[in-house]
Amino acid sequence: MKLSTTSKEDFFKHWPGHWPDKDNFVNPHKATKEQYLAFKGLIDQKPLETEIEAFLKDNKEILALITFLFSTGHHASWLYPKQYLRLPASSTSGKIPDYIVAGANSDGVSWFVLELKGANENAFINNSKRVHLTSVANKGICQLIEYIDISTRSQSYLRDEINLKGYREPKGILLIGTEEESENTQVREFKSAWNRMNSRIQIYSYNRLLRTIENAIKPS
């Protein structure tokens, strides 16, 4: 069942039993050119993480299109902002990704944990002829590793207690920076190598997401 080719009434009437709940459903096919242009204008200013979060909170359809980067979400998408994966306790801090994201296609539902960083940040540093992660990107990667590990160890709790139906084996996504840093050949090649070798945690710039959004909203 694909929302882009089905009436809204039929879509919700025939909601598949294995899909997540309807409350967090977001229709990525409702993303508009106006939303895209507003988001592009924002990213062009290299905003802080908080500014990006504020925009996406009011433009969920734009963020839902991140699932298209992984060839899913065409049937339906779901967004869970600031959802606890682990509640805080006396000896441990709570674990809250910026978003839990789900996308459905003909193969089923795929899950992701998303960490946002500012478009003003870089993912990589190139000095002394070596490329390595910036402190901001490294923090984001470590956060995603924790989220994925907790998700793997607590799947039953997350599915049953906080109603993440079907939640399993999420991939991590770090959104950070723009493609300006990839103008450096070494950085571009290192980033490409990272994403090839680390399929569980992918690093993308906001420009990459913008291209995906632009392609999705083009008239067919």
PLM feature segments, named:
Residues 1-220:
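Charged, terminal alpha-helix-loop-beta segments
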